[in-house]
Amino acid sequence: MNQRAAGAVYEQQARRYLERAGLTFTAANVTLRGGELDLIMRDRHIWVFVEVRYRRNAHFGDAAASVTRHKQQRLLHAAAVWLAQRGASFDTVDCRFDVLAITGDRFDWIPNAFATQG
C-alpha cells in the first residue's frame, strides 16, 4: 500500500472514531491554496478542522508530536481560505483545530490542539 492509500485508510478510521464521539462529517482531503485539510467536522455549532497523523510506533515520537509549528500555520491558512470561500472567518464563526493521532493501534484525540491565533 502506498503512502497516499495508507493515509486515506487512517483518515477513514479517524472519521469513524470522531463520528462515534458525536461529531458530524463535512468534508475530507480538502486541498486549498497553501495547504490541505484532512477532515472538516462539526461539533454542534463549531467547525472542527482535524489533522490526522499516523505513526507505526513511538520510537521517533508519537504522531501528535509531528504537527510542527509550520504545519499548524499551513492548517490555519487553509482553514481561513475554506471559511472565506463560505463568507466566514475566524472572527465570525466558532472553530477549533484538533489532532487525531494514531500511534500503532492507539487513538489519541486532542481537541483544541492549537489556537487560531497560531
From Swiss-Prot:
Q: What is this protein called?
A: UPF0102 protein PC1_0307
Gene3D superfamilies, per database record:
3.40.1350.10
The text of the family note is:
Belongs to the UPF0102 family.
PANTHER family membership = UPF0102 PROTEIN YRAN
GO MF entries = nucleic acid binding
Record InterPro entries? Restrct_endonuc-II-like, tRNA_endonuc-like_dom_sf, UPF0102_YraN-like
Pfam families recorded: UPF0102
